[in-house]
Amino acid sequence: MATPARRIPRVRVRGIYATALTKLVIDMGFQVVQPSRIIADRFSLPMLTLPADVTIKDSDNNPSELLIVGYEWAVNIILEKLRDTLPYSFYWRSSLPLHSTVKARVIGLRDNRCIARVGDVEAELLVDRSECIEDREVVGGVVRPGVKPRETPRIVPGARVIGDYAILIESSEPRVTISEHVRSPEKRALLAAIATSFTEQGYAVHWRSSSQHAEREELEKHLRQLREALAEARKRAEEGPPGVYSEGEAVVLVHLSSADKQKLDEIRDSVVATIPYHHTVKSLQPSLSKVIDYAEKVKALGVDSEKLVRALLELVAEDLASRRRIRILHVKPSGEYIELGKAEIKSVYVEDKSLVIVLERTVKSRGVYDGLGVEKEPGDRIVTEVRTDEWIVKHTYYAPDGTVKGTYININTPPEIAEDAIVYLDLEIDIVKKPGKKPKIVDAEELDKYHEQGIVTTKLKEKALEIARKLAG
């Protein structure tokens, strides 16, 4: 089982941010375990094989997102520090702990899914329609935690508990599964053998990757402890109201902004030669990854970093100039990705330490421009100005005769250039200006909402408000 919260968290770090994050973890006073060989050599770390309380790595679905998974007490400690160090990103946290035992009360069928409530959280309960009976109470385990606001947690019947080496599950189909990271055939055979007596008692066993480092006696003891914990969780859940009855894992996704990636660049540079935009390129422009590697080798030989960055920006500008069109992609605090559609690239150049890009779209349909409340007509032009060092993207709307219909200034984190898109975190609050009228702030309440939910940090909210007030005069 997990060790009490008084212990310093043990952290496993993987992925494209590993060097910067390992430096952060060490500076925060936490213990790095199961380091990769490169990280162990880079930081002169011992190859500790102790089980991790928290794992931090880039998400398999989006390399601009950090995935943080671990015991809730440990994740709480990590997040408190991380939100201070990387304040300009979005933080999404699971609404129910993964692999926890819960008691849910059925609400009923909705869109052919059985919906139940655990406290104030709605979740999908995986049962037959005939078992989806209003007010029925079910003891189950969380198999999908629901991380982003629009994601619904998922529960299956049967209690479950998680520990350092295994997950033990009440199951009508007892079986043994083993992490793909346990590669030794001998170890896999041993794990299967140890679990046999538990499957015979009606439990499913999943061995976690850390099990490859433990001895047989420790693993057998661990399963016995999990069995006791599961029985206790089952008993308390049956006797208590709907709620969470065993410790699970918190799951957090952090969508890193360009500003926070630059902070990670600086942290990495304190360990090994790193140029600005390292993490932006590694996460969003993998085709330029070797260019970054080469530039950093050259920097290590004494070449000025500013010259290397200038060359990198000019390379990106030349690539953009050779294209005709590019997408504009908002990342919303809700977790949605909103594409504005492809725009024609009119010009692109380097100015100081920034890329300046001018885009144009031609309107083909009728309607009303959101925020401006101005009629949209076929033939209108939308000219968009993007600077990669500014916290805004400016859209100016023109009638076919060239008359300005209005200006919409999107407040966002400094834009990044991906392989086929301009990407930024949309901060919801915006500025609109009609001809002859003063600029006006819109959608400030949306920013407040996501701040209250903990998705937007206080520092990011204050930054967005500062920009909005300055632009509104």
Curated annotation (Swiss-Prot):
<keyword id="KW-0694">RNA-binding</keyword>
<keyword id="KW-0540">Nuclease</keyword>
<keyword id="KW-0255">Endonuclease</keyword>
<dbReference type="Pfam" id="PF10150">
    <property type="entry name" value="RNase_E_G"/>
</dbReference>
<dbReference type="InterPro" id="IPR019307">
    <property type="entry name" value="RNA-bd_AU-1/RNase_E/G"/>
</dbReference>
<keyword id="KW-0698">rRNA processing</keyword>
<comment type="function">
    <text>Probable RNase involved in rRNA stability through maturation and/or degradation of precursor rRNAs. Binds to RNA in loop regions with AU-rich sequences.</text>
</comment>
<dbReference type="Pfam" id="PF04167">
    <property type="entry name" value="DUF402"/>
</dbReference>
<keyword id="KW-0378">Hydrolase</keyword>
<protein>
    <recommendedName>
        <fullName>Probable ribonuclease FAU-1</fullName>
        <ecNumber>3.1.26.-</ecNumber>
    </recommendedName>
</protein>
<dbReference type="InterPro" id="IPR035930">
    <property type="entry name" value="FomD-like_sf"/>
</dbReference>
<dbReference type="InterPro" id="IPR050212">
    <property type="entry name" value="Ntdp-like"/>
</dbReference>
<dbReference type="InterPro" id="IPR007295">
    <property type="entry name" value="DUF402"/>
</dbReference>
<dbReference type="InterPro" id="IPR016730">
    <property type="entry name" value="RNA-bd_FAU-1"/>
</dbReference>
<comment type="similarity">
    <text>Belongs to the FAU-1 family.</text>
</comment>
<dbReference type="GO" id="GO:0016891">
    <property type="term" value="F:RNA endonuclease activity, producing 5'-phosphomonoesters"/>
</dbReference>
<dbReference type="GO" id="GO:0035925">
    <property type="term" value="F:mRNA 3'-UTR AU-rich region binding"/>
</dbReference>
<dbReference type="GO" id="GO:0006364">
    <property type="term" value="P:rRNA processing"/>
</dbReference>
